[in-house]
């Protein structure tokens, strides 16, 4: 069975501390909407419902009609965000969750359409390129929750190792990303990244 709209939840990971950017990335604006609003829209256009935002407890953001959840494993990085997303999706009765980092504004709904077509027999899907997996724009099966929690309790935070473990467990399928498509997974880390993207759409 492939992932379908009724079985697919979504989560925007917005809990990073944005040290290099100097301000909360989730509240940066691009083409009239905040990055948090944009990523929620992209996930919904991809057929994900419900969509949640995973954030730090002290963060405040205004995105209408979207549940916000906080990291359970505080300070444990993106893996803690994925764990919180998986837990929320499991509570909603979803079989898969599409996860998208708030600072990847080149990802469009079609990205998840391609991944959904790879989700067979309950497996999730992740893109891999020359530098490794792209774990923050991926579809995870809900049964990845136990693996995430087990690794976090052991103090392990590596997203690359987490995804590699899921691939070994045959819970994730790998989709190759051509080198000429690498621009799609660029993220905003510094103010110059934001400014460069804004100039494209000026």
From Swiss-Prot:
One of its GO terms (biological process) is Mo-molybdopterin cofactor biosynthetic process. GO terms for molecular function: GTP binding; metal ion binding; molybdenum cofactor guanylyltransferase activity. GTP binds at residues 13-15, 25, 71, 103. Its cofactor is Mg(2+). Mg(2+) binds at residue 103. Keywords: Cytoplasm, GTP-binding, Magnesium, Metal-binding, Molybdenum cofactor biosynthesis, Nucleotide-binding, Transferase. It catalyses: Mo-molybdopterin + GTP + H(+) = Mo-molybdopterin guanine dinucleotide + diphosphate. It is found in: Cytoplasm. It is an enzyme of class 2 (transferase). Its EC number is 2.7.7.77. It holds the Pfam family NTP_transf_3. Disulfide bonds: none annotated. GO terms for cellular component: cytoplasm. Belongs to the MobA family. Transfers a GMP moiety from GTP to Mo-molybdopterin (Mo-MPT) cofactor (Moco or molybdenum cofactor) to form Mo-molybdopterin guanine dinucleotide (Mo-MGD) cofactor. The N-terminal domain determines nucleotide recognition and specific binding, while the C-terminal domain determines the specific binding to the target protein. This is Probable molybdenum cofactor guanylyltransferase. It comes from Opitutus terrae (strain DSM 11246 / JCM 15787 / PB90-1). The gene is mobA.
